[in-house]
Curated annotation (Swiss-Prot):
The lineage of its organism: Bacteria, Pseudomonadati, Pseudomonadota, Alphaproteobacteria, Rhodospirillales. Keywords: ATP synthesis, Cell inner membrane, Cell membrane, CF(1), Hydrogen ion transport, Ion transport, Membrane, Transport. F-type ATPases have 2 components, CF(1) - the catalytic core - and CF(0) - the membrane proton channel. CF(1) has five subunits: alpha(3), beta(3), gamma(1), delta(1), epsilon(1). CF(0) has three main subunits: a, b and c. It is found in: Cell inner membrane. Produces ATP from ADP in the presence of a proton gradient across the membrane. The gamma chain is believed to be important in regulating ATPase activity and the flow of protons through the CF(0) complex. Transmembrane segments: none annotated. Its main location: membrane. It holds the Pfam family ATP-synt. Belongs to the ATPase gamma chain family. The gene is atpG. NCBIfam families: ATPsyn_F1gamma, PRK05621.1-4. GO terms for molecular function: ATP binding; proton-transporting ATP synthase activity, rotational mechanism. It comes from the Bacteria. This is ATP synthase gamma chain. The keyword Cell inner membrane applies.
Length: 299
């Protein structure tokens, strides 16, 4: 049985940990509201961009000289996987889910005979994958902001990806990130960003922009090819930006939930330790009283 001194020390230690987890929960909660609003506000823009590019792609299908960002390189032998994780832990299964999804995707592609390269945005992704895939990891970026995500960050990362694509270092690029649903729910998402994947609604001829009436006829100025040449690189940056916003909101939600659970568990542990401490102290006092009474009777 632990001594009273040991129990007091453990109670003090758990209380100290509880203060830390409670503070981290409040910090994550304050960041979550803004991160959630930003991620949700970006969704309509990115979705509209996808539909517009899908319509442009459909109207230029079969034309010669299509951009490789749209039509691809003509092969899919080399795949670049961009994994979005956090720089820090203490956020439940947030990082682990991305690491597992990336690991699964790498194995699937390698089983098909593809060459896989990994670019990790966030320290935890690189740390979790480098042991199993040291040769596949070609870079890691761990300097993204822990307070807010700016478009300049996404633009910098997208330029790196585009430079690699133009240099012929890969054929297909897939983004793996957590899409935010709620503070307790995040969905691991795989999104192909190079070459551009036409949305299923556009590919099926069902543009959701208009639910009734005649199908819209678009006229473009300048030409479709010029618009695509300008928008396709921007779309890569926008999709990376959306992934980063969704990932950041998911991280804050996961951390708030994890720290809330940790705070509750610490409270339960303090109650149990306090009960054990009081029982031990009571038993010790009772034992001392018995010894005193026994000594008095002997006299």
């Amino acid at each position: 049985m632990a001594s009273l001194k040991d129990l007091r020390s453990r109670i003090t230690s758990v209380k100290s940990t509880q203060k830390i987890t409670s503070a981290m929960k409040m910090v994550a909660a304050s960041r979550l509201r803004r991160a959630q609003d930003t991620a949700e506000a970006a969704r309509p823009y990115t979705q509209r961009m996808e539909r517009m590019l899908g319509n442009l792609a459909a109207s230029t299908a079969g034309m010669a000289g299509a951009s490789p960002l749209l039509g691809g390189t003509g092969k899919d032998n080399v795949h670049l996987i961009v994994a979005l994780t956090a720089n820090r832990g203490l956020c439940g299964g947030f990082n682990g889910s991305i690491i597992r999804a990336t690991r699964t995707l790498v194995r699937e592609l390698e089983a098909q005979g593809k060459t896989v390269k990994l670019l990790c945005i966030g320290k935890k992704g690189r740390d979790g994958l480098k042991r199993e895939f040291p040769k596949q990891i070609i870079g890691g970026i761990a300097d993204q902001s822990s307070k807010a995500i700016g478009f300049s960050d996404a633009d910098r990362f997208s330029r790196l990806i585009l430079d690699m694509f133009q240099a012929g270092e890969f054929d297909v690029c897939t983004l793996v990130y957590n899409r935010f649903q709620s503070a307790i729910s995040q969905v691991v998402t795989r999104q192909q960003i190079i070459p551009f994947a036409v949305p299923t609604t556009v590919a099926a001829g069902n543009d959701n922009d208009r639910t009734a009436g005649p199908k819209a006829i678009y006229e473009y100025e300048p030409s479709e090819e010029e618009i695509l040449a300008d928008l396709l690189p921007k779309n890569v940056a926008i999709q990376v930006f959306r992934g980063m916003l969704e990932s950041f909101a998911s991280e804050q939600g996961a951390r708030m939930t994890a720290m809330d659970n940790a705070t509750r568990n610490a409270g339960d542990m303090i109650k149990k330790l306090s009960l054990t401490y009081n029982r031990t102290r009571q038993a010790q006092i009772t034992k001392e009283l018995i010894e005193i009474i026994s000594g008095a009777e002997a006299i």
